Amino acid sequence: MRKAKPKKRVILPDPVFNDQKVSKFVNHLMYDGKKNTSYEIFYAALETVKAKLPNEEKTALEIWKKALDNVTPQVEVKSRRVGGATFQVPTEIRPDRKESISMKNLILFARKRGGKSMADKLAAEIMDAFNEQGGAFKRKEDMHRMAEANRAFAHFRF
């Protein structure tokens, strides 16, 4: 066990939208400390989203936030061992973990898409998530389905 709980690091807002959520997303997107490249990919993806949805009254940032909300899980299952048997126990997810999972899933499924540049793949995944489709949305639905199937074990609290 550690002595004290580690302090939360302050994440500075991004330069364009002045939003902490964007900075956090870019940090997840980043490889090898190349944050500028990550920002370029993210902003290019938002430009692509705006170009492909011209008649949408929302801004590209609002579309991205809605897409993130659509892929954010509310419950997850955790393994709990009780008397020799392992149960999948559904548990609520902390708000900061919800955000982190949704960002990581969106990026993971964007990377899994074939071909094109990362900006295009990310834009496509954002649009799919906005329309409640795509891999990241399916992952969230699967998590909820697993939790629902194992609802009988919800009384095994952690």
Swiss-Prot record:
The keyword Protein biosynthesis does not apply. GO terms for cellular component: small ribosomal subunit. GO terms for molecular function: rRNA binding; structural constituent of ribosome; tRNA binding. Keywords: Ribonucleoprotein, Ribosomal protein, RNA-binding, rRNA-binding, tRNA-binding. Gene3D superfamilies: Ribosomal protein S7 domain. One of its GO terms (biological process) is translation. The keyword Ribosomal protein applies. InterPro entries: Ribosomal_uS7 (IPR000235), Ribosomal_uS7_bac/org-type (IPR005717), Ribosomal_uS7_dom (IPR023798), Ribosomal_uS7_dom_sf (IPR036823). It holds the Pfam family Ribosomal_S7. One of the primary rRNA binding proteins, it binds directly to 16S rRNA where it nucleates assembly of the head domain of the 30S subunit. Is located at the subunit interface close to the decoding center, probably blocks exit of the E-site tRNA. HAMAP family: Ribosomal_uS7_B. Part of the 30S ribosomal subunit. Contacts proteins S9 and S11. Belongs to the universal ribosomal protein uS7 family. This is Small ribosomal subunit protein uS7.
